[in-house]
Curated annotation (Swiss-Prot):
Keywords, comma-separated and alphabetical: DNA-binding, Endonuclease, Exonuclease, Hydrolase, Nuclease, RNA-binding
Cofactor requirements of the protein: Mn(2+); Ni(2+)
Function: Shows sequence-specific endoribonuclease activity towards single-stranded RNA (ssRNA), with a preference for the bond between pyrimidine and adenine nucleotides. May also have 5'-exonuclease activity.
Organism superkingdom: Bacteria
Catalytic class of the enzyme: hydrolase
InterPro entries: ASCH_domain (IPR007374), PUA-like_sf (IPR015947)
Protein name: ASCH domain-containing ribonuclease
Boundaries of every ASCH domain copy: 13-70
Keyword DNA-binding: yes
Pfam family, one: ASCH
Entry EC no(s): 3.1.-.-
Species in which this protein is naturally found: Zymomonas mobilis subsp. mobilis (strain ATCC 10988 / DSM 424 / LMG 404 / NCIMB 8938 / NRRL B-806 / ZM1)
Cofactor binding: number and manner: Active in the presence of Mn(2+) or Ni(2+) ions. No activity detected with Zn(2+) or Co(2+).
Length: 148
């Protein structure tokens, strides 16, 4: 029987400055244009893109809010750790936005791309997010508890 992802564990790719801000708790909202929606309370593993190329922590999904670009900026912009201009540039050409409200941010010892490929042979950093299967999550968790 194949272990099908249940939308409770996912990896999301972010630029390093935003990834670090999430795991430190400074950034509590992540905005996206179009993205598959995880289950509420899902654990979102934070992958920092180049030059870091590692999972550096996780946070839990408290809520998903979808709506008008202007409304979401007004409501959550202060928690997003980005400028209004960056936000406007990202959402240029669309009227709808999705906000992930994050809680319980946890930095971890970085898990690099080679280690991620040991968990999933064809692992590629996701464009938006990728679901994890139960056995993949277990392997990821075991790597977070290993002593260097």
């Amino acid at each position: 029987m194949t272990d099908i992802p249940d939308r409770k564990e996912a990896v999301i790719s972010l630029w390093p400055e935003f990834a670090k801000a999430i795991v430190s708790g400074k950034k509590t909202v992540e905005f996206r244009r179009r993205i598959p929606l995880p289950a509420l309370s899902a654990r979102i593993w934070i992958y920092a893109t180049r030059p870091v190329k590692s999972v550096i922590g996780f946070a839990y999904l408290e809520a998903i809010v979808q709506g008008d670009v202007n409304t979401l900026w007004s409501r959550y912009g202060r928690e997003a750790f980005l400028s209004e201009q960056q936000y406007r540039d990202y959402f240029e050409g669309t009227e709808k936005a999705t906000a992930f409200l994050l809680r319980d941010h946890q930095p971890i010892r970085p898990i690099n791309l080679d280690q991620l490929k040991e968990i999933r042979a064809n692992f590629q950093p996701p464009q938006s997010l990728t679901w994890l299967r139960k056995e993949e999550t277990q392997k990821l968790v075991s790597l977070t508890s290993q002593v260097e």
